[in-house]
Amino acid sequence: MSLVNPHGKEKVLKPLLLTGEELTAEKARAQSFAQVRLSSRETGDLIMLGIGGFTPLTGFMGHDDWKGSVQDCRMADGTFWPIPITLSTSKEKADELSIGQEVALVDDESGELMGSMVIEEKYSIDKAFECQEVFKTTDPEHPGVLMVMNQGDVNLAGRVKVFSEGTFPTEFAGIYMTPAETRKMFEANGWSTVAAFQTRNPMHRSHEYLVKIAIEVCDGVLIHQLLGKLKPGDIPADVRKECINALMEKYFVKGTCIQGGYPLDMRYAGPREALLHALFRQNFGCSHLIVGRDHAGVGDYYGPFDAHHIFDQIPADALETKPLKIDWTFYCYKCDGMASMKTCPHTAEDRLNLSGTKLRKMLSEGEQVPEHFSRPEVLEILQRYYASLTQKVDIKLHSHAVGK
């Protein structure tokens, strides 16, 4: 059997990253272009366009694709796309630019020239409409809403040429991978069914349990962590990488899973982001996405299994990658092991509810972490990280984190 096809009608990866002489020539040309500065989110999106992670997109979305994606999870040509991929700038900057003009795309933080774009469209959007549809809220306390509300007032659309993957290939060597690379690894392992495990946390016992369930039913698992920006209080990628390596070395059969990483910032869009996670995992070659409790959620904005339900609401042919839905998992003292709501008959008093938020809060406040919460090797790395922090971040416990 072969791997799932890349997303889109043509079913082929479309990486937009230039190489060799073409890259040298286009970078030289772009030196004289007017510059458009990219936010961290936009830079991550551009890199995903570059490596083919956002196949079949060829650039940042125009108005009709933006509206279709926001309102119906479909672009103007009918391609399924659950979250808009857009580039914004100020009205003042947009007024200086004309349709058909080539612009240089520059990462605002590093100043690196990341790519170029031919402007095909300039348009304004209703930000509140986008937030309500995508995030199901316009609350500015929601980090994804804040991101959209703070972006420029004008969107620029057009085909892009990508020059760089930023620091990801060097900073996360051996972890950061392109879709072509993961597909090659899966094929070398003889895998055709591969489950992706999305994570922005070091893996506690529930995460380990979810991955092991997937290993039982698939050929292998891609533990695929987000390498872009998170909200304050979340644990940085280099620490997560060390934790996952320790866990894989001590508690997983070799050859059953691969640790990888991708360059996006977290959007915290809950159910909609779960769909995007499945979509680009299809491009990476994964047949399944593990969807547990409160996937891609934040606070109490989403129900614990809204991300399960949304997959039942999209057309059956929207994605080849399917959800591997797993119920609430926990450690049960009476079962003497990890269990779920489907397998454990005992009461809440017998269970230790596990969540990344709860673990971060305990570590941040120097509390004793219960024995069955995390593997000791992982805990040791996390305790060392928290001991090194000079500034404490206040972490709020939402209801899902405490088992409600």
UniProtKB/Swiss-Prot annotation:
Broad EC category: transferase
InterPro entries: ATP-Sase_PUA-like_dom, PUA-like_sf, Rossmann-like_a/b/a_fold, SO4_adenylyltransferase_pro, Sulfurylase_cat_dom, Sulphate_adenylyltransferase
Record's keyword terms, sorted: ATP-binding, Nucleotide-binding, Nucleotidyltransferase, Transferase
Annotated catalysed reactions: sulfate + ATP + H(+) = adenosine 5'-phosphosulfate + diphosphate
Protein name in the entry: Sulfate adenylyltransferase
Gene name as annotated: sat
BP term (GO), one: sulfate assimilation
CDD domains documented for this protein: ATPS (cd00517)
Gene Ontology molecular function, alphabetical: ATP binding; sulfate adenylyltransferase (ATP) activity
Family: Belongs to the sulfate adenylyltransferase family.
Organism encoding this protein: Chlorobium chlorochromatii (strain CaD3)
